[in-house]
Amino acid sequence: FFHLEHRDYPTFTELYQFIENRADESYKMISSEMMKHILLYIKSAYDGALSPLFNGITNIDAEDFIDFDMRDLMQGSEECQRAVLFNISTYLWNRILLKEGWTMLAIDELHMYLQHPYMRKTLQSMVLRARKYNAMIWCATQQITHCLNPQYAYEVSSLLNSSPIKFLFNLGDVELGEVKKALSLKDGEIKCIAAAVKRHCLVLAGKERYAIEVGTLPYEEHLFGKGGGQ
């Protein structure tokens, strides 16, 4: 794999045409009928609904920083979401297993991924095993209550309990008792984030609790600008 360029790998078009050209031939190990079944399985990735996602040369660069823009995907069909999430999570975990230096996996809008059973199981496994492969996992969500769905409370509690450091900002207009119970917070700790105060948050580091004000370093404005994420 280290000697091949991304353009050296076949696309689904090439695979489909290769099998189609041989579908009427007879082989000892595979029948013509079996090859036609294979064509049916891969047709959606060849020229069907999944073709825009799967049928083409990869545009993933093997660089130090890779960004997967999932916004449009998460608005698509359930079938597309499952297929792409499976491929991406498999790719990410394989990269982590290589142990090529230190790796950080950052996931924004965590609650959206927790809606998928496969992703819940995958994230749970990653969080428990990542440190063995010189990796760390960083997750963020605007509303932690969106993650506290009773249907998958066990998997989410595993994610929360395995996280050594948590940053909690003001939670907005939500039921604080639910968050207090999920994160084992005391009344005084919940008070720290009960009001919306810009840049103030509660940090949970193991058994330690810190009420802090988040500042900026001199060079950060040059790197990120003043748009506040815009």
Indicate where each model-derived feature is located.
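P-loop NTPase motor domains
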Residues: F1-A135, Q151, C192-A196, C201-K207
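Acidic, low-complexity intrinsically disordered tails
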Residues: G229-Q230
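Conserved ATP-driven motor cores of ASCE-family P-loop NTPases powering translocation/secretion/packaging/pilus
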Residues: Y118, T122-L217
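Long, polar/charge-rich, low-hydrophobicity segments
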Residues: H222-L223
